[in-house]
Design a protein with these regions (language model features):
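Generic cytosolic/nucleocytoplasmic N-terminal low-complexity/intrinsically disordered segments
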Residues: 1-2, 19, 40, 64
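Bacterial N-terminal signal peptides
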Residues: 8-16
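Mobile, glycine-rich extracellular loop/lid and propeptide segments
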Residues: 30-187
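Sec-dependent signal peptide recognition
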Residues: 2-8
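Bacterial Sec-dependent N-terminal signal peptides
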Residues: 15-38
Length: 187
């Protein structure tokens, strides 16, 4: 799933320099674009409390038809059933101690990058069963894990740790990368 997405994104960046030739002119009916694609909105929802939604990072699991969304203001990973995309249904989320910054899914496992309440301290990568939402494992990451992804073969998890300084710059952890070997269950 990720490889075609990466290829599509790379093609989009490459072809964006040619897009002006295909946009048309004001008042003209737009065509279907370079690849014959036309996007149509089929549904929308607000993730989070109040009028403001939170959906910075999300990951979709095709088997369960669930969308997992980082929701830092509510301290959770929100879970949505989008088997009917025009009518998404919010399910029980995953409450966390710390702030979720990123999510990814691979073959029945959800990985969550969790920021420590003290941003300069090490965060964690938490793994959950995609169906039951039960915690499977937790691994220590560097300071402020800001991105998490599975390797294409699912053998590894990689996290980018931002390492943000405190307000007066007396503590400034270095940025780092965490690599987790899932077979050996070690960092």
């Amino acid at each position: 799933m990720k490889k075609p997405l990466v290829i599509a994104l790379m093609a989009g960046v490459f072809l964006s320099s040619c897009i002006k030739d295909y946009i048309g002119h004001p008042g003209e009916e737009p065509d279907k674009g370079l690849l014959g694609l036309k996007f149509t909105k089929i549904g929308t929802f607000i993730n989070g409390a109040g009028d403001e939604g939170f959906a910075e990072i999300s990951a979709y699991d095709d088997k369960t038809k669930r969308l997992f969304i980082v929701n830092p203001n509510d301290g959770e990973v929100s879970v949505w059933d989008i088997s009917n995309p025009s009518s998404a249904v919010k399910q029980s989320g995953i409450s966390l101690t710390g702030t979720p910054n990123s999510v990814d899914v691979h073959e029945g496992v959800l990985a969550v990058a969790v920021e420590n309440p003290n941003k300069q301290a090490n965060g964690s990568i938490a793994l959950y069963d995609i169906e039951s939402l039960q915690l499977l494992e937790t691994y220590t990451a560097g300071a402020l894990p800001d991105m998490v992804t599975f390797s294409p073969n699912g053998k590894y998890i990689v996290a980018a740790n931002e390492g943000e300084p405190n307000d007066d710059y007396t503590v400034d952890p270095e940025g780092s990368i965490t690599v987790i070997d899932l077979k050996k269950k070690e960092i």
